[in-house]
């Protein structure tokens, strides 16, 4: 993985071509590299160190308030888990009625302020102010997720990221 990389992007949402370079460096001290399957039924880091995942799921911890994010990191720092699974995209569900701190796309979210635990299953809204531009990512959203991944790595915790959440 370690080498300089060059990228070129041409797309309908860009004015012209974007290109750039970035280096991939060796892991920092204490980081064993990415996790992969080893010997068919086990896991290991890139350097061969065995990895025994003991994890938890916190679907949108990184999209909650800064206070709750810090509380989550303090709890994880106690060492109970070495892996946390979470979503890249915000999610409303019975345990989460808060608006996320950011969204992955540019645009305006629908108003869910009237959603409650009691009406969650039946809540339907047609919000004509809901304007998402699914062709334009919100870079700050993903920069924040990368920052959270770095904070987890500093604690020795692997990020198990849910990209698509069909249920």
Residue ranges of each PLM-predicted region?
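Ligand-binding face of N-terminal immunoglobulin V-set domains in extracellular IgSF glycoproteins
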Residues: 1-27
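Active-site mouth of glycoside hydrolases
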Residues: 14, 27-167
């Amino acid at each position: 993985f370690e080498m300089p990389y060059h990228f070129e992007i041409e797309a309908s949402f860009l004015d012209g071509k974007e290109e750039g370079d970035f280096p991939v460096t060796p892991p920092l001290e204490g980081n064993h590299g990415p996790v992969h399957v080893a010997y068919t039924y086990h896991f290991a880091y890139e350097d061969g160190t065995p990895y025994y995942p003991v994890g938890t799921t916190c679907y949108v911890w990184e999209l909650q308030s800064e206070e709750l994010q810090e509380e989550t990191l303090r709890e994880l720092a106690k060492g109970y888990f070495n892996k946390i699974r979470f979503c890249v995209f915000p999610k409303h569900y019975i345990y989460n009625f808060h608006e996320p701190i950011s969204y992955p796309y540019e645009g305006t979210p629908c108003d869910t302020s009237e959603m409650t635990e009691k009406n969650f299953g039946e809540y339907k809204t047609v919000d004509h102010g809901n304007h998402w531009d699914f062709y334009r990512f919100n870079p700050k959203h993903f920069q924040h997720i990368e920052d959270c991944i770095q904070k987890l790595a500093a604690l020795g915790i692997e990020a198990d990221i849910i990209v698509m959440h069909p249920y």
